[in-house]
């Protein structure tokens, strides 16, 4: 009887070893979807990230990247596609689904960034540090890899905006509820246009301007239709880099550990530094392409901040009223 028991233990041990060995040998191919062109900073970062993971895993992790919405369509479908398993991983800005991620969209409020600065390395790292505590619930159904914030967004326009009064009546593409409210306060006419459609919308006269950093404006080829850019950046735009939870949980422990190690706040900071470098390069390149940079006066900036102040308070209060930790998140993010 003892031998029988020992035999069963040996059989079970052998079966476990074979299962573990099979998992070690199995290849996992993941689909990564995003909405932006291949010349955008995120796509370049994603290529390097996936290549590094493929190498580190000895070829057990492989990736197929789908830019420009090739896999799931418009930007506003990206995160739901990751939830539903149409794609395994997605990257998109929260503002393409206004009001759906209200806590994250507080990052979109005017001149609201950490005291350490508005650079993407700072904002992205800070947002990612806070995400597990404050943002996980409103991203239910997703495994957040990191969150990020773009460089401060400017107004790219076909008409010059040199001063505050020039905003009046100008139709401007916006991203996110908070940007819409700010443009309203400036007298502009905000219109919701998905990022890949901005250039065509300006060319057709549907809008006269759009809110983007220099880097995104270059990747979207806006200089062909918008020869004016207004600085300084008035706000920023939050993004999510997220994975389907079932797909994540289906991976062996060592592969999950590789993904964990290569994402999170440190990865967000690294991505942000790349974004910062590309922003400077893009600004220089756009000037070469004939874009004129207009700088608002200190008095105009002060007036914008004055108009934005009640909106900031109202936005935070609305998130709190909905039972979400708006004020706590905002205070932690901006301190």
Description of each model-found segment:
Residues 1-11:
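Bacterial N-terminal signal peptides that target proteins for export
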Residues 26-120, 133-335:
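N-terminal secretory/targeting leader peptides
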Residues 7, 16-18:
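Intrinsic disorder/low-complexity segments
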Residues 1, 25-26:
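Absolute protein N-terminus
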Residues 18-25:
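Sec/Tat signal peptide C-region and signal peptidase I cleavage site
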Residues 12-13, 23:
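Cleavable N-terminal signal peptides
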């Amino acid at each position: 009887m003892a031998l029988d028991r020992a035999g069963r233990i040996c059989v079970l041990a052998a079966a476990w070893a074979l299962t573990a060995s099979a998992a070690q040998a199995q290849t996992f191919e993941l689909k990564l979807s995003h909405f932006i062109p291949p010349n955008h900073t995120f796509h370049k970062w994603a290529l390097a990230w996936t290549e590094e993971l493929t190498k580190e895993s000895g070829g057990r992790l492989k990736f197929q990247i789908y830019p420009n919405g090739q896999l799931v369509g418009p930007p506003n479908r990206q995160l739901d596609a990751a939830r539903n398993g149409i794609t395994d991983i997605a990257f998109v800005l929260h503002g393409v689904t206004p009001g759906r991620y209200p806590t994250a969209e507080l990052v979109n409020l005017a001149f609201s960034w950490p005291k350490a600065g508005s650079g993407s390395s700072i904002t992205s790292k800070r947002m990612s540090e806070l995400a597990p505590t404050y943002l996980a619930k409103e991203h239910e159904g997703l495994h957040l890899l990191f969150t990020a914030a773009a460089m401060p967004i400017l107004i790219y326009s076909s008409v010059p905006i040199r001063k505050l009064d020039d905003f009046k009546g100008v139709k401007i593409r916006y991203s996110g509820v908070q940007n819409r409210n700010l443009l309203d306060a400036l007298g502009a006419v905000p219109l919701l246009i998905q990022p890949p459609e901005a250039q065509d919308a300006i060319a057709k006269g549907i809008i006269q301007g759009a809110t983007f950093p220099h880097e995104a404006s270059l990747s979207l080829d806006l200089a062909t239709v918008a020869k004016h850019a207004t600085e300084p950046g008035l706000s920023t735009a939050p993004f999510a880099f997220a994975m389907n939870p079932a797909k994540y949980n289906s991976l062996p422990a060592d592969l999950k550990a590789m993904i964990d190690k290569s994402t999170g706040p440190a990865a967000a900071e690294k991505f942000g530094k790349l974004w910062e470098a590309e922003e400077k390069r893009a600004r220089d390149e756009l000037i070469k392409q004939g874009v004129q940079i207009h700088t608002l006066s200190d008095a105009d900036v002060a007036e914008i901040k004055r108009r934005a102040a009640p909106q900031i308070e109202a936005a935070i209060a609305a998130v709190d009223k909905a039972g979400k930790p708006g004020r706590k998140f905002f205070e932690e993010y901006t301190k």
